[in-house]
């Protein structure tokens, strides 16, 4: 009596034992395609990202908020986005964060540094006019300016060159009374301007960090 041969192939000609291997190969190919696509997108985004000038570490911040800045170029390629950490204020490629708890100057700088920033430098009247919109007139805010050696040589903490012609002191300031070698931005005499104060004086502060620019 003749015996039937066991069926060795499925309809269509594929051996049953090959099916798991084929599925595994297809799955690996799909993963490879997804990985390559992810790498291309990451590379594209990274190549578009241009950091602003100065020392900063936006990687300290999990989320960014981007604001489109005006550009003289009308084309889409000429548009620029300035990105800052959430809750920071954006102005001309920089980011600002006022904090109202009181610390000494050194403590304030350490706090800003922990966020990848420095105490605020002020280079123009426009920059000062921008930040005062977000300040409390009842408070004083440390800036990143001090006379570290008490010799009348003012320096910005982030090494920004100090321009003695671009200063915004209150009248009769700085007076260097009682070793006042640090600077606060304070509202007095109906305007915001600078006063020198002792560095162990406790005040609020403004942190500043260069933003990330996307073209």
UniProtKB/Swiss-Prot annotation:
**Which ranges does the record list as Cytoplasmic topological domains?**
1-17
Subunit-structure text: Heterodimer with CLEC4E; disulfide-linked. CLEC4E acts as a bridge for interaction between CLEC4D and FCER1G to form a functional complex. Heterodimer with CLEC6A; this heterodimer forms a pattern recognition receptor (PRR) against fungal infection.
Localization: Cell membrane
Protein induction:
By autocrine inflammatory stimuli.
Quote the protein name from its UniProt record. C-type lectin domain family 4 member D
Any GO BP: antifungal innate immune response
Q: How does it sit in the membrane?
A: Single-pass type II membrane protein
- GO terms of molecular function: carbohydrate binding; D-mannose binding; immunoglobulin receptor binding; metal ion binding; pattern recognition receptor activity
Tissue and organ expression note: Expressed weakly in peripheral blood leukocytes, bone marrow and spleen. Expression is confined mostly in monocytes and macrophage and seems to be up-regulated by IL-6, IL-10, TNF-alpha and IFN-gamma.
Q: Where does Ca(2+) bind?
A: 173, 175, 195-196
- Disulfide pairs here are 84-95, 112-207, 182-199
Q: Which CDD domains match?
A: CLECT_DC-SIGN_like
- Glycosylation sites recorded in the entry for this protein: 45, 102, 111
Q: Which residues form the C-type lectin domain?
A: 91-208
Which PANTHER family does the record cross-reference, listed alphabetically?
MANNOSE, PHOSPHOLIPASE, LECTIN RECEPTOR RELATED
SUPFAM superfamilies tied to this protein? C-type lectin-like (SSF56436)
Q: Which domain of life is it from?
A: Eukaryota
Q: Which InterPro entries match?
A: C-type_lectin-like (IPR001304), C-type_lectin-like/link_sf (IPR016186), C-type_lectin/snaclec_domain (IPR050111), CD209-like_CTLD (IPR033989), CTDL_fold (IPR016187)
Instruction: Tell whether Membrane is among the UniProt keywords.
Output: yes
Query: Keywords in UniProt for this one?
Result: Adaptive immunity, Calcium, Cell membrane, Disulfide bond, Glycoprotein, Immunity, Innate immunity, Lectin, Membrane, Metal-binding, Signal-anchor, Transmembrane, Transmembrane helix
